[in-house]
């Protein structure tokens, strides 16, 4: 099937669906009409899309952790703990690494080995292997909406199972769950596989079942300039809307400068709505998610809480609908349930104290928003041009030409010629533009900001700054300064 940004026909969708459900025996558990009936009985307080709509209308920010273990009962106990003790507003099920690579036989071994060991030997919840019945048991054991969070380039079977299991949100997209996660997955294949996931959600919407879709905003989580991550989020929102998705949460990963982060999140929401309306998608409800710091964390727990609360402050002042919570064990590895709950509690405390407060518009905020919007528009305009009006085709060509270029992405289809670095205030700017199609005016703005840092630090603008910035937060500060600064 040729890639194009056009809603799949029922015939195209159901033909491919026959093959998808054969990928693992639990695919047989999915009966679409029965799933529609089941989902219609899910109470609204456990529907992810509905809860996001209510939160946005109320002007509050919801807190959602990451969490997932191999065994069903242990996973349920973990989620209940984060719900009851942590006070989470929304629940995740972080999916294990084997499922992300469609290696279900190894998942099965991991489940059996976990049972023998009496603890999880997988780094997440193997949703496909637990099947529709297992996913429903999880949903029926908690009081909050559930979302699958993963990193799967081919999420088709996983999407079928989790949605039939009553989970009303799926994270990911054809760019954001490929370029940062995989080395050798062709971009056109991944885009088609995610068109399937979106078409599935579109089918449910046609039956009156509301399901949320969330592009993964932080990408590689390492110094991603806001305009690049925003361009990805807007692209994935447009591709999802074409397949019939009506409830979309666009995401952004904290860069660290409060003003830039607030500007970026507001630009993301505004431009997503602008582009959706410009292309005729007038009935899509857009919300935002802010990811707490995705880079290296300090090992000291008290310092880690400082990072968590700073991020929460930014999310709240930006007006995010949701914040993804980190834990004080981030630098060490997979957190205990207690550490995970403590991250949620710290986040919720900050959200409660800041409820209703927003960063007011200022000259500086206005300038930053104008820059981000202009840069984002340059990227998106070129993508539409490359695809001759077709954004899916334009996405493939944008990666081929380096117009879209994700810093530090492992994919061999990513140019890797663009290089980011912080300016003197900690904003993430473009050090090397590669083939990112900015105007000379925008390029000069980036260069001027970096020259200010070079002057302050008494050194040349160079790749050493990038290295210093990558490790800075783990060492206790935002900007990677030389020792004498």
UniProtKB/Swiss-Prot annotation:
Gene3D superfamilies attached to this UniProt entry: 3.90.970.10, Methylmalonyl-CoA mutase
Source organism superkingdom: Bacteria
EC id: 5.4.99.1
A GO MF label: cobalamin binding
Disulphide bridges: none
Residues reported to bind adenosylcob(III)alamin: 68, 123, 180, 297, 326, 330, 334
Function: Catalyzes the carbon skeleton rearrangement of L-glutamate to L-threo-3-methylaspartate ((2S,3S)-3-methylaspartate).
Subunit relationships: Heterotetramer composed of 2 epsilon subunits (GlmE) and 2 sigma subunits (GlmS). GlmE exists as a homodimer and GlmS as a monomer.
Protein name: Glutamate mutase epsilon subunit
Annotated source species: Clostridium tetanomorphum
